């Protein structure tokens, strides 16, 4: 397995008095700004999550370097008496509105407790910003208006985590990937199903998309193709030793062709991964071809050795490449973004990932050519 050289590597969050988990990364193209989010916790455990924090990075295209500002707390992103978890940033290019979605869970109530009691106490929340995250609106609890009575049919749920997606359709639809543990049988354990929250009116109202196959959890989505050939590609965590993927022909409402992706291995209990899509370097401007890149631990036994995979025909689950290593040793969740061309003329990526025993959250920047030098067109 080859190791990828990188343009920049920098620790953004380091566990000392507080712990940090669950990275989310968003690139704002016109502002040349990166927003790196994470959960700030009293300890590494999920029940000790507290707030969502942010570091802002300014990208210098001349030096291919990101300068990061100090950590700040997104103080509005909280419900009283609840802990804030799973940051999911989304930027609406048409309205120039930045959304930060997250879940709010009361006190120290765990996900496992909700699964055992079958009582869903998790809330769907968001804050917004019209100045690229400098200032934020008061928190909005969207649970009743978006999920409604369906909330009681779930044992619990969560969004993302990581970046969301705005589609290239006429409505500029907004998609927030999510999953819910459904109570399908009074005796059987609740079962996780991935889906998307969808907005057709730039975030004013939201609806629930339909579910992907069972045993699909934390997920991300990417848009592949254009026009009549445009589909939403979903890639989800599972407990079955490999990732699960599906595609939606109707902008995230329904998913079909649910498939196990045997080349994308999962460790026991699975792990979050990140996916982005971009135009193939070998395609003409009017070509429909897209390429997908995906980051995730590469070991099927442990959360170790973060890799990046490439798929030049993303709807084919057998077409994923062998991974290129981004980092060795213990690692876990990651979030991936792509913007512009790097100094070698190939697409450039930023990756925010958990390292060590959740000791650090690290930012990496690299190019397609650095990761996959033999890909035609990345020379």
UniProtKB/Swiss-Prot annotation:
The entry lists its GO molecular-function terms as: exo-alpha-sialidase activity
Residues annotated as the enzyme's active site:
46 (proton acceptor), 333 (nucleophile), 354
Q: Where is this motif: FRIP motif?
A: 20-23
Biological process annotations from GO: ganglioside catabolic process; glycoprotein catabolic process; oligosaccharide catabolic process; positive regulation of myoblast differentiation; positive regulation of myotube differentiation; response to ethanol
Instruction: State the Gene3D superfamilies in the record.
Output: 2.120.10.10
Which top-level enzyme class is recorded in the Swiss-Prot or TrEMBL entry? hydrolase
Recorded hits in CDD domains, A to Z, give: Sialidase_non-viral
Where expressed (tissues)?
A: Detected in skeletal muscle.
Intervals holding BNR repeats: 127-138, 197-208
According to its UniProt record, which protein family does this protein belong to? Belongs to the glycosyl hydrolase 33 family.
Q: What is this protein called?
A: Sialidase-2
User: Which species expresses this protein natively?
Assistant: Rattus norvegicus
Report which gene this protein is encoded by.
Answer: Neu2
């Amino acid at each position: 397995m080859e190791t990828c050289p990188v343009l920049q590597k920098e620790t953004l969050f380091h566990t000392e008095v507080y712990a940090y988990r669950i990275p989310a990364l968003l690139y704002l193209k016109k502002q040349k700004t990166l927003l790196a989010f994470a959960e700030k916790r009293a300890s590494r455990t999920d029940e000790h999550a507290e707030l969502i924090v942010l570091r802002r990075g300014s990208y210098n295209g001349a030096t291919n370097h990101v300068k990061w500002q100090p950590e700040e707390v997104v103080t509005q992103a909280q419900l009283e008496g609840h802990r804030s978890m799973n940051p999911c940033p989304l930027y609406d290019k048409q309205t120039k509105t930045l959304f930060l979605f997250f879940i709010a869970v009361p006190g120290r109530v765990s996900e496992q407790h909700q699964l055992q009691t079958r009582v869903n106490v998790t809330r769907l929340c968001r804050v917004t910003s019209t100045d690229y995250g400098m200032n934020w609106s008061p928190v909005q609890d969207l649970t009743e208006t978006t999920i409604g009575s369906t909330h009681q049919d779930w044992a619990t749920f969560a969004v993302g985590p990581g970046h969301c997606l705005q589609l290239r359709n006429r409505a500029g639809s907004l998609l927030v990937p999510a999953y819910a543990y459904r109570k399908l049988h009074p005796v059987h354990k609740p079962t996780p199903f991935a889906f998307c929250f969808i907005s057709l009116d730039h975030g004013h109202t939201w609806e629930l998309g339909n579910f992907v196959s069972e045993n699909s959890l934390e997920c991300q989505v990417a848009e592949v193709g254009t026009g009549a050939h445009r589909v939403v590609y979903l890639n989800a965590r599972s407990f079955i030793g490999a990732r699960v993927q599906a595609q939606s022909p109707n902008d995230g409402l329904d998913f079909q062709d649910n498939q196990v992706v045997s080349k994308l291995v999962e460790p026991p209990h699975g792990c979050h991964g990140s996916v982005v899509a971009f135009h193939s370097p070998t395609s003409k401007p009017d070509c429909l071809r897209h390429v997908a890149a995906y980051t995730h631990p590469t070991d099927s036994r442990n959360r170790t050795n973060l890799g990046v995979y490439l798929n030049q025909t993303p709807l084919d689950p057998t077409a994923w490449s062998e991974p290129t290593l981004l980092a060795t040793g213990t690692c876990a969740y990651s979030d991936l973004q792509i913007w512009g061309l790097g100094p070698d003329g190939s697409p450039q990526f930023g990756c925010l990932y958990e390292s060590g025993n959740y000791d650090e959250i690290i930012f990496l920047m690299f190019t397609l050519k650095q990761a996959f030098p033999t890909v035609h067109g990345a020379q």
